[in-house]
Curated annotation (Swiss-Prot):
This protein's record includes keyword Secreted: yes
Pfam families named in the record: Cystatin (PF00031)
Protein's job: Inhibits various C1 cysteine proteases including cathepsin L, papain and cathepsin B. This protein has no toxic activity and its function in the venom is unknown. It may play a role as a housekeeping or regulatory protein.
Species lineage: Eukaryota, Metazoa, Chordata, Craniata, Vertebrata
CDD domains: CY
Protein name: Cystatin
Amino acid sequence: MVHSQLPVAAPLRLLCALLLLPSATMIPGGLSPRSVTDPDVQKAAEFAVQEYNSLSTNAYYYKQLRIVEAQSQVVAGAKYYLTMELMKTKCAKATGKPKVYKEIQNCELPPKAQQEKLTCHFQVWSRPWLEKMELTKMSCN
């Protein structure tokens, strides 16, 4: 009688094991959650902030306060979906050489009453073999 239950027990164990796997491993090309401290996420976030500041018509730089959420998708490279909080700084954009990310992060914030915080959604497409990143989507409010 024990032998007749064996063929049923093995597939059930396999099914249970598959259900316990993280969902991201089961969906090739699907979105996977990423740690906001992951070095690749940090690099994509730096790029997004740099691009935001170069595209923005605001007279002042915005710096990264925090990465709220990060996801990635395997495409021809990796696409990072980032939700970030940015804050307007006291550093004015002067004509000439624009500030780089690390310089912007060192900019002082205005007093609390004058602070302007944005929540931004960025999509950054990374293709490391081409040494190329591209901001494919951006929305801030």
